[in-house]
């Protein structure tokens, strides 16, 4: 059973996004600057669209935090939308005079659904005759709220269990970074300074070249991000039920990110291509205790963390808003046409890594709270230490 609960609300061009996180203990350090720093990281990356140049995330805590520390009550965060004045009438909650709306170009019905987006299926499911009510919520803008919550979860993980999370881009279109090179928390500043958040300089240049070519071609690109969690204790998650397995929870959280179409834990799909003798992590006794000789499993076995480096990958498809517009129909006329196009990114894979960090942080925070409990950070910290000091097999 989950210990933490989180929800987000709001639309892409609404006044703000709102996020709530329930279940954290008192005493987790968090400030608006800490949240804003991670939101700024979400805007990073070569190939982003025009919105990233002027989008600013105005962070306000609405509850659950006092003087930089959580209170043990639900944490509520608002991420303001600096573009709201342009959309105040189009996205108004209360009715607006139809005559006013008729004169607004932004309010034109979006009747040409975009392939790869939620537009058409959402219109059919909810009974809308245009895509605006669907795309506003389906937009990846919503991930800003999850990154905000992830900032709180990260602080909780570091304060209670010493867990730190890093991501990097390992593939972007045909360009790939060398396999098996894992950044550490000490590399975050260097990663964030790289245009595509790739640790390998040669691979980074190749990725930038891929983005430049896609821009010239009027196309978009996807890629693969890898998230690593350091100092994760053994025993998070459980083997006893399918929905308590940590790898299942991680996969679900990552698949819930817009445009993510595949997830693997550890060596994932590669393990299906090798014999069992080369697929598993052998166990040895070392001066530091019981360890695995390799990290093929990605730090989980049987739904539980092993105490080794936790490693997951997520594959992001190319952005569906393609500049050269894909074929669709106009639902108002039934005629064949080209999909609606608005400003968009050529590539958002580097930003997807930041969102993936947030989702991994939230899942791990839930697992830590589930395993160790505690109504305050010191209590949870004591519980973690006691557990690790008293492991039967160490």
UniProtKB/Swiss-Prot annotation:
SUPFAM superfamilies: Chorismate synthase, AroC
Keyword hit for Nuclease: no
PROSITE patterns found in the cross-reference section: CHORISMATE_SYNTHASE_1, CHORISMATE_SYNTHASE_2, CHORISMATE_SYNTHASE_3
Enzyme class: lyase
PANTHER family recorded: CHORISMATE SYNTHASE
Annotated family: Belongs to the chorismate synthase family.
Function of the molecule: This reaction introduces a second double bond into the aromatic ring system.
The protein, known as: Chorismate synthase
Native organism taxonomy: Bacteria, Bacillati, Actinomycetota, Actinomycetes, Kitasatosporales
């Amino acid at each position: 059973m989950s210990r933490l609960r989180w929800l987000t609300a709001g639309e892409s061009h609404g006044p703000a996004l709102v996020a709530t996180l329930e279940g954290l203990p008192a005493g987790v350090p968090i400030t608006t600057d800490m949240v804003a720093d991670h939101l700024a990281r979400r805007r990073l990356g070569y190939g982003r669209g025009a919105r990233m140049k002027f989008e600013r995330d105005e962070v306000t805590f609405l509850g659950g935090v006092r003087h930089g520390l959580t209170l043990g009550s639900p944490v509520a965060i608002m991420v303001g939308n600096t573009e709201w004045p342009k959309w105040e009438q189009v996205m108004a909650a209360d009715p607006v005079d139809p005559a006013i709306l008729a004169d607004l170009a932004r309010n034109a019905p979006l009747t040409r659904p975009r392939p790869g987006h939620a537009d058409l299926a959402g219109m059919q499911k909810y009974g809308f005759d245009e895509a605006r009510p669907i795309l506003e919520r389906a937009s990846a803008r919503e991930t800003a709220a999850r990154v905000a919550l992830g900032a709180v979860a990260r602080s909780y993980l570091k304060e209670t269990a010493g867990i730190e999370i890093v991501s990097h881009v390992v593939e972007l279109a045909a360009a790939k970074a060398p396999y098996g090179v894992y950044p550490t928390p000490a590399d975050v500043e260097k990663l964030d300074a790289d245009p595509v958040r790739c640790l390998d300089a040669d691979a980074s240049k190749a990725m930038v070249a891929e983005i430049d070519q896609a821009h010239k071609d009027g196309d978009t690109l996807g890629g693969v991000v890898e998230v690593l969690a350091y100092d994760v204790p053994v025993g998070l998650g459980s083997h006893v039920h399918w929905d308590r397995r940590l790898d299942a929870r991680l996969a679900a959280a990552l698949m819930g990110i817009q445009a993510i179409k595949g997830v693997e834990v550890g060596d994932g799909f590669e393990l299906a291509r090798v014999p069992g003798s080369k697929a598993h992590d052998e166990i040895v006794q070392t001066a530091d205790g019981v360890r695995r000789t390799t990290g093929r499993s990605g730090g989980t076995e049987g739904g539980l963390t092993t105490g080794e480096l936790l490693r997951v990958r997520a594959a992001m498809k190319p952005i569906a808003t393609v500049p050269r517009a894909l074929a669709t129909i106009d639902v108002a006329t039934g005629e064949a046409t080209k999909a609606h196009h608005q400003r968009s990114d050529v590539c958002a894979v580097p930003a997807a890594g930041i969102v993936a960090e947030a989702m991994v942080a939230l899942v791990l925070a839930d697992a830590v709270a589930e395993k160790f409990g505690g109504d305050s950070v010191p209590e949870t910290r004591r519980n973690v230490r006691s557990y690790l000091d008293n492991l039967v097999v160490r």
